[in-house]
């Protein structure tokens, strides 16, 4: 099968498909690559056979020099346009040279081209025993990398200039073959001129004869297509026709080698030779060889380089010559040549690696330049025409010709026609699963892990050749958008670029991260491998190929481990095939360690089964299974140890850490390279670093490959950055939304429970790699890259924590990373922030990671933060595939107390908390970040280890304690109900899988949180059994009920969303696919949802009441609050924040907050990151905000409409009553709030972000009765209904604090916090319809007007202290965020909000970046709402203008707002987070329009209540200064203020959730002060005119 090109091609196709699936979910691209692979396979086989036939048949046909020249003119004509266009050079010049490839100068051409390119050196080494040419070739190759453009233009000029001369000279050369050392220009021109003179007939003849001469010439032509005249001259008199024929054949071979050259060449050849198959093959070959053959050519160059470097010995030259000759025989089949060349390349892979990469880019740019990949593509592209050969190369080629030409001619065999697959002499399975020429990853994972020496040698070119070449071509072409870059990289441009420069500087020689530097091209994100290939091509100009070699080699060591690293280093040092072709696997093994690791990664990630992996990677299935189980057992054992104490996060934390550190130097480097740079290195199997990471994670996670697959799917999950980016892209404001999400994630602590670091790390690294082109733009302004880095750092820390290195305090490491060079900074900042969240345990993890990185010396640059962060995950994962520091189910830090080990559910919950409310997490930092810091570190770290731990060991404990802890223990665990509730959420996610998969769990946990807690013990019984033990971990057949309903729900949703097939979802979520098939149908899914929701509803109502009571008792939900919260959040847990990435689970959204972090990922509209809801209204806010956040605009709209119909009357009545009560309360509250805000200036923010004060809780309870009624009316399912009602009501009724009447006293102290909580619960019954019927609520437009004036007076009392005001502005943005995602996005700025639902509001709030800006943002919201109401979408600009130009309100308000901002920032720590991630003004300006627009749209959709509250908040300072201006009755003002306070509180929480928003807000401080003033004046108008215009129903409809 190995010798069968078809089998090899099939494997290549599989590999391509696998890598494409890994790297991109872009089916178009996948299909394209698959088609390319198929065509390549077919073409290769046909080309090899036909080339052999043609070379054998036509080798006898000697074309005259004129015929050869005729061939050349076509090339020459093609080459003429080439100089201007590298791509043309790659395509057009290659084609003409392909037709007239100077195979007449077959040997000389080969030598010249080889000299020109690596192939020149290879040909020289092959034909000539001179090592000088080899060195020259390598040197020239490097020079060409840097100067190929220059050479190309020079060669083109020379080509045009000497055409006539060269025609004559070529004729003379053919006559006098010894005078082969014509100037490259002359040689090329001569060929071109002859071709021009002798048009197509000679070309046909040349083709006919060229095939014959092509055998000898193919070797040479592959090496040097440019030296056509030289080849002609080289060919002795008798050989001149032969040489011409060889030139034709060389052209054909070059065509094969070069994508573009092959096309024309093959077309002409088809015309001349009637090669219909070649026509098809070459057309596609041009497509694929542009990609695949560009790489094939690169690989040919590799082989030629190997010939030059490694084949110095005559025997080797002979062998190489045979190889080349054989490909020449397959003149058209560059693949044959490539395989030959690769055969040589295997020997020379180390040297070729850099050359290959460089040339690949050249090939990609100029790939067509010369079919013989070795030719420098820029000049060689012309070289194939005889134009392109640079002078040095020509000289070297001439030398090679003179020395080698006779030898080659004498020894050049008329391509042994039927000698089908000489390159395949060793089956790819035998050759470490790689064909010598098939090193190219397309062969299959072999290339990835096949021979570590080989991967190290040419990780990019060898591994990725066919598919990677196609991908690279596509990337270069921009065929498919870079998956991550476009989505995630709006912010990535600056920060990722910032990371990239370090990558670039360090990667060139040192690091596997060189691949990362290579993927710097934006397209690189899609296919790291291809990117690496392509980027080295692009980077080669800047990066020395040798550096690339080194970096390429390093990734290899990582792949092969320390031995591989040594071998790779040796190879890099030798520059020749220092690593045996067999690879690191060893002579006795047909597979390399790298392949084994790649296979294990695939298996663990669930990408492959052991059976398929065994076939693909050529590794015995028994070996794979043994390794997988061994890893799983080790992981579980270590996880058990880790679960024993939540600190050791990974199974073999210390021991494995040392091993991993060593392996990390090699394997981690490999993994990092695999993830980022190594993607190229692990092209075939590691083409998708995330899969590798996931594979590694799965290994860690599960002992059973099946379970591993599920685990990987789950780990992969939730929201892979790809999904996140994809949704962000779909959102339209992908950058902002993703930025907000990621930044909030940073605030959260950088470890996103929902995001698998294994997934995110590779994805982030892809992002960073894609941002590499922007590395010059490095700024930490873009916090997404920082967050991404932090995610990667989190993985690193997880690895470190697993390794047990948790020494540095978070801030120390934070500062250490920040103070460290940007690379370390990029690494460190994510780690810093994560560590800030995770604090010392993760700080220690980070330190250990840093130590590991230091230990990985070469990986310092490899440790390029994204890479290293990913490397942290990969390093933990890649070091030992066993180790997957992706998220083990670490309980939230607070919930770490559950089992002492974080559960994936806890982790997801923690992340939900962190993501949901960064500020609150900061506030809860002691409990969530601080208390949970070990757990949070575990959250990231233990997720991999604890997936197994928690599932095997802790699942029982978790579910036992989880029920207890999540029921009541969580309260103790968490500082507030927020973290605690999240912990239960996380708890369920951990159990919901076989126990291994935390990430998907949160979604499942969200739906089944209540169930999960109800059935934790049953799950304990079930899951520990599958999870515990190496072999016991694999779920046994027949344990069909062993899956969590949450997992089932999540799987069903994933299938329904079209994210996965039933089978994949079944394995991914660990549920039987047969069951899943039935459940996928809506009716089946609805039943579990209803049950989950009913449980959630019951618990939510329960919890709302209990939480309200607890809130009344505790400012932050205490244990009692947490317990209710947990129950309300059990619905949240059902969604399980993590599943969001897989797809937003609407029911899960409704059911539980934990899904939020992922929901924002999925839908940037809902992304008003659940954090604030959790943070602010522990039980109530989470209940309310989850609806707002989780309920997509659609769901919210539908539910709101339903509730509208049912509750309009009730709400209106309640609104009237509440308004009256609120007016009274607000009057009282204005006084009380003034005092309370002064008191709460410091504490109110905390109280607000806490579950609200006890009064707010009490009010929430009181209002929950109507809420329960409305829930009963609206949603029998409770979880969805109650949460949606709460969310919708809170978002809709943010302006209508019905609870305020009950909370009059509570509001004095807690108005903001209680607004959020009270409104959610009390508004649930009334406010929902009132908000839905915002018109009724907006109907009191005077309120808005009053709000404008009263907001000040309302704020006046509270803002008099100046502290309450800051709290509210903080919330204002938060409010905008929370309602805006649900309301504004749908109603007013559906598009904007959809674009960046959480970010826009927070960014509109961010637009008024300060707390001043926040209050101003409320003003802006009003003004923008008003404008939007009046002007539609133009209010954005007006709002901005208002911000900038119309400071109509007293600066007193601004100052008060600023004070409020400062105070709130202090209180919330969320502003501090923002300070940590301060967004520069540029970013603000960049986000301003979108943010403001979103803000206005959100405000409009939130509509007047939020605006009123915001205005009140904003205007409270104004009111303080302008109380005389207050013309509206205070009761209404108070009501409005309360209403505004609720949204503000929510917004404040959202602001805490969305650090980015706060950052933007801070950035917008100055602008927002103005805008706040202006907005106040305008907001009054808006209140009057705009408020009634847009109603909640409008937002619901939208």
Swiss-Prot record:
Pfam family name, one: HTH_psq
Residue stretches making up the HTH psq-type domain: 582-634, 1034-1086
Effect of residue 444 to A: Loss of phosphorylation
Biased composition (Basic residues): 140-151
Bias type Low complexity, positions: 164-174, 210-263, 445-461, 653-687, 820-855, 1003-1021, 1103-1120, 1309-1318, 1447-1466, 1501-1547
Locations listed in the record: Nucleus
Comp. bias regions, Polar residues: 1562-1577
GO MF terms held by the record: sequence-specific DNA binding
Composition-biased stretches (Gly residues): 965-975
Biased composition (Basic and acidic residues): 175-191, 292-305, 315-324, 335-346, 1093-1102, 1383-1392, 1407-1442, 1481-1497
Matches recorded under Gene3D superfamilies: Homeodomain-like
Chief localization: nucleus
InterPro entries per the UniProt record, alphabetical: Homeodomain-like_sf (IPR009057), HTH_Psq (IPR007889)
Ranges of biased composition (kind: Acidic residues): 275-291, 694-705
Keyword set, alphabetical order: Activator, DNA-binding, Nucleus, Phosphoprotein, Repeat, Transcription, Transcription regulation
Keyword hit for Metal-binding: no
Modified residues (Phosphoserine): 444
Residue ranges, annotated region (Disordered): 83-105, 140-387, 436-462, 495-525, 636-705, 797-877, 962-1045, 1082-1145, 1248-1283, 1301-1598
Tissue specificity note: Large-type Kenyon cells of mushroom body.
Assembly, per entry: Homodimer.
Protein task: Transcriptional activator which binds to the consensus sequence 5'-CCCTATCGATCGATCTCTACCT-3'. May play a role in higher-order sensory processing.
Domain notes: The second H-T-H motif is necessary for transcriptional activation.
Protein name: Mushroom body large-type Kenyon cell-specific protein 1
Organism: Apis mellifera (Honeybee)
């Amino acid at each position: 099968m190995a010798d069968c090109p078809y089998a090899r091609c099939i494997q290549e196709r599989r590999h391509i498909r696998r890598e494409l699936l890994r790297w991109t979910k872009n089916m178009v691209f996948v299909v394209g690559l698959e088609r390319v692979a198929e065509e390549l396979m077919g073409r290769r086989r046909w080309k090899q056979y036909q080339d052999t036939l043609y070379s054998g048949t036509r080798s006898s046909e000697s074309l005259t020099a004129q015929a050869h020249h005729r061939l050349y003119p076509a090339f020459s004509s093609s080459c003429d346009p080439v100089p201007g266009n590298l791509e043309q050079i790659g395509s057009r010049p290659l084609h003409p040279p392909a037709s007239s490839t100077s195979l007449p100068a077959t040997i000389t051409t080969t030598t010249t081209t080889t000299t020109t390119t690596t192939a020149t050196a290879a040909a020289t080494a092959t034909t000539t025993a001179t090592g000088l040419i080899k060195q020259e070739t390598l040197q020239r190759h490097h020079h060409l990398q840097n100067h190929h453009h220059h050479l190309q233009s020079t060669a083109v000029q020379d080509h045009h200039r000497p055409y006539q001369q060269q025609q004559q000279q070529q004729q003379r050369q053919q006559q006098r073959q010894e005078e082969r050392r014509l100037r490259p220009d002359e040689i090329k021109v001569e060929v071109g001129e002859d071709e021009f003179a002798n048009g197509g007939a000679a070309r046909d003849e040349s083709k006919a004869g060229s095939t014959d001469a092509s055998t000898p010439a193919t070797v040479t032509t592959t090496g040097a297509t440019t030296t056509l005249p030289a080849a002609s001259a080289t060919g002795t008199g008798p050989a001149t026709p032969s040489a011409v024929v060889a030139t034709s054949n060389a052209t054909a071979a070059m065509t094969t080698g070069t994508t573009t050259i092959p096309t024309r060449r093959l077309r002409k050849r088809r015309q001349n030779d009637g090669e219909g198959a070649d026509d098809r093959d070459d057309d596609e070959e041009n497509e694929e060889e542009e990609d695949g053959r560009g790489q094939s050519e690169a690989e040919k160059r590799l082989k030629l380089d190997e010939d030059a470097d490694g084949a110095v010995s005559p025997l080797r030259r002979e062998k190489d010559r045979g190889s080349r000759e054989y490909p020449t025989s397959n003149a058209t089949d560059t693949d044959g040549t490539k395989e030959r060349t690769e055969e040589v390349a295997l020997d020379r892979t180390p040297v070729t690696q850099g050359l290959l990469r460089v040339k690949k880019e050249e090939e990609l740019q100029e790939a067509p330049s010369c079919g013989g990949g070795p030719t420098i593509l820029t000049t060689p592209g012309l070289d194939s025409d005889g134009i392109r050969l640079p002078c040095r190369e020509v000289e070297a080629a001439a030398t090679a010709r003179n020395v080698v030409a006779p030898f080659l001619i004498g020894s050049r065999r008329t391509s042994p026609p039927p000698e089908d697959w000489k390159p395949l002499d060793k089956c790819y399975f035998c050759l470490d699963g790689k064909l010598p020429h098939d090193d190219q990853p397309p062969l299959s994972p072999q290339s990835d892990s096949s021979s570590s020496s080989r991967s190290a040698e040419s990780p990019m070119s060898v591994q990725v050749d066919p598919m990677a070449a196609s991908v690279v071509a596509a990337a270069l072409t921009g065929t498919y958008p870079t998956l991550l870059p476009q989505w995630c990289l709006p912010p990535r441009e600056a920060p990722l670029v910032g990371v990239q420069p370090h990558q670039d500087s360090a990667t060139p020689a040192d690091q596997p991260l060189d691949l990362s530097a290579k993927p710097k091209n934006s397209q690189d994100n899609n296919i790291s491998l291809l990117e690496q290939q392509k980027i080295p091509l692009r980077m080669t100009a800047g990066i020395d190929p040798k550096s690339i070699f080194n970096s390429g080699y390093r990734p290899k060591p990582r792949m092969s481990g320390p031995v591989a690293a040594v071998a790779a280093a040796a190879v890099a040092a030798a520059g020749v095939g220092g690593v045996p072709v067999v690879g690191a696997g060893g002579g006795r093994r047909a597979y390399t360690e790298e392949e084994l690791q790649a296979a294990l990664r695939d298996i663990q990630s669930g990408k492959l089964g052991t059976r398929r992996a065994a076939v693909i990677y050529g590794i015995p299935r028994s070996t794979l299974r043994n390794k997988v189980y061994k890893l799983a057992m080790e992981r579980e054992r270590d996880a058990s140890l880790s679960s024993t104490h939540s600190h050791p996060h990974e199974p073999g934390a210390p021991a494995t850490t040392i091993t991993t550190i060593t392996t990390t130097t090699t394997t981690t480097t490999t993994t990092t390279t695999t993830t980022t740079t190594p993607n190229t290195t692990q092209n075939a199997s590691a083409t998708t670093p995330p899969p590798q990471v996931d594979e590694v994670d799965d290994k860690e996670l599960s002992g059973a490959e099946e379970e591993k697959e599920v685990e990987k799917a789950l780990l992969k999950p939730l929201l892979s950055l790809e999904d996140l980016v994809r949704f962000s892209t779909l959102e339209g404001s992908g950058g902002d939304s993703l930025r907000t999400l990621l930044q909030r994630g940073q605030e959260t602590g950088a470890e996103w429970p929902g995001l698998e670091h294994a997934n995110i790390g590779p994805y982030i690294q892809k992002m960073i790699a894609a941002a590499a082109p922007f590395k010059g733009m490095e700024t930490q302004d873009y916090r997404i890259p920082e967050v991404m880095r932090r995610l990667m750092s989190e993985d690193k820390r997880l690895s470190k924590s697993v390794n047990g290195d948790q020494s540095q305090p978070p801030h120390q490491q934070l500062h250490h990373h920040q103070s460290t060079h940007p690379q370390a900074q990029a690494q460190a900042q994510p780690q810093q922030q994560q560590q800030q969240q995770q604090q010392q345990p993760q700080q220690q993890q980070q330190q250990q990671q840093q130590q590991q990185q230091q230990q990985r010396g070469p990986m310092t640059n490899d440790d390029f933060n994204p890479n290293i962060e990913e490397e942290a995950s990969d390093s933990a994962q890649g070091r030992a595939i066993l180790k997957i520091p992706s998220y083990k189910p670490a309980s939230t830090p607070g919930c770490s107390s559950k089992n002492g080990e974080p559960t994936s559910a806890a982790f997801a919950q923690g992340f939900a908390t962190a993501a949901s409310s960064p500020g609150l997490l900061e506030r809860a930092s002691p409990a969530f970040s601080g208390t949970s810091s070990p757990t949070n570190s575990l959250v990231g770290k233990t997720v991999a280890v604890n997936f197994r731990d928690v599932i095997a060991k802790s699942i029982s404990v978790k579910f036992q304690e989880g029920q207890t802890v999540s029921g009541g223990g969580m309260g103790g665990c968490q500082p507030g109900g927020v973290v605690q509730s999240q912990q239960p959420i996380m708890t369920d996610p951990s159990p919901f899988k076989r126990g291994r998969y935390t990430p998907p769990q949160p979604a499942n946990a969200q739906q089944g949180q209540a169930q999960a807690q109800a059935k934790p013990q049953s799950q304990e019984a079930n899951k520990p059994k599958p999870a515990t033990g190496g072999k016991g971990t694999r779920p046994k057949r027949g344990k069909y009920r062993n899956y969590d309903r949450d997992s089932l729900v999540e799987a069903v949703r994933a299938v329904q969303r079209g994210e996965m097939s039933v089978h994949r979802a079944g394995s991914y979520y660990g549920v039987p696919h047969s069951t899943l098939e039935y459940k996928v149908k809506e009716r089946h899914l609805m039943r579990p949802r209803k049950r989950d929701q009913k449980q959630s509803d019951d618990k939510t109502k329960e919890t709302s009441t209990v939480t309200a009571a607890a809130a009344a008792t505790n400012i932050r939900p205490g244990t009692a609050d947490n317990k209710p919260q947990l129950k309300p959040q059990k619905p949240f847990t059902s969604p399980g924040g993590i599943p969001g990435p897989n797809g937003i689970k609407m029911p899960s959204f409704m059911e539980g907050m934990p899904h939020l972090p992922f929901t924002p990922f999925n839908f940037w509209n809902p992304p008003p990151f659940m954090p604030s809801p959790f943070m602010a209204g522990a039980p109530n806010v989470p209940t309310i905000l989850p609806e707002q956040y989780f309920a997509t605009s659609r769901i919210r709209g539908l539910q709101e409409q339903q509730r509208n119909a049912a509750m309009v009357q009730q709400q209106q009545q309640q609104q009237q009553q509440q308004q009256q009560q609120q007016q009274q309360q607000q009057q009282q509250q204005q006084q009380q709030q003034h005092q309370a805000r002064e008191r709460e200036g410091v504490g109110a923010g905390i109280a607000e972000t806490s579950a609200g004060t006890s009064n707010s809780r009490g009010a929430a309870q009181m209002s929950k009765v109507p809420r329960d009624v409305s829930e009963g009316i609206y949603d029998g399912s409770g979880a969805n209904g109650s949460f949606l009602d709460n969310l919708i009501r809170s978002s809709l009724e943010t302006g209508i604090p019905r609870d305020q009447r009950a909370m009059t006293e509570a509001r004095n102290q807690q108005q903001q916090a209680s607004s959020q909580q009270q409104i959610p619960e009390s508004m649930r019954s009334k406010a929902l319809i009132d908000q839905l019927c915002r018109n009724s609520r907006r109907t009191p437009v005077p309120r808005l007007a009053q709000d404008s004036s009263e907001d000040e007076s309302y704020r006046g009392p509270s803002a008099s202290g100046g502290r309450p005001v800051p709290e509210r502005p903080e919330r204002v943005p938060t409010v905008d965020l929370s309602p805006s995602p649900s309301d504004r996005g749908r109603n007013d700025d559906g598009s904007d909000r959809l674009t960046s639902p959480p970010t826009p509001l927070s960014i509109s709030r961010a637009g008024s970046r300060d707390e001043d800006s926040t209050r101003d943002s409320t003003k802006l919201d009003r003004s923008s709402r008003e404008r939007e109401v009046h002007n539609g979408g133009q209010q954005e600009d007006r709002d901005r203008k208002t911000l900038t130009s119309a400071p109509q309100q007293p600066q007193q308000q601004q100052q008060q707002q600023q004070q409020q901002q400062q105070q709130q920032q202090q209180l919330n720590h969320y502003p501090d987070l923002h300070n940590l991630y301060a967004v520069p003004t540029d970013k603000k300006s960049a986000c301003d329009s979108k943010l403001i627009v979103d803000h206005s749209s959100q405000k409009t959709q939130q509509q007047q209540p939020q605006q009123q509250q915001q205005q009140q908040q904003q205007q409270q300072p104004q009111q303080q200064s302008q109380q005389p201006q207050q013309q509206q009755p205070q009761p209404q003002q108070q009501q409005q203020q309360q209403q505004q306070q609720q949204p503000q509180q929510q917004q404040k929480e959202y602001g805490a959730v969305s650090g980015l928003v706060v950052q933007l807000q801070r950035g917008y401080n100055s602008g927002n002060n103005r805008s706040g003033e202006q907005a106040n004046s305008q907001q009054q108008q808006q209140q009057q005119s705009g408020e009634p215009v847009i109603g909640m129903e409008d937002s619901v409809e939208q």
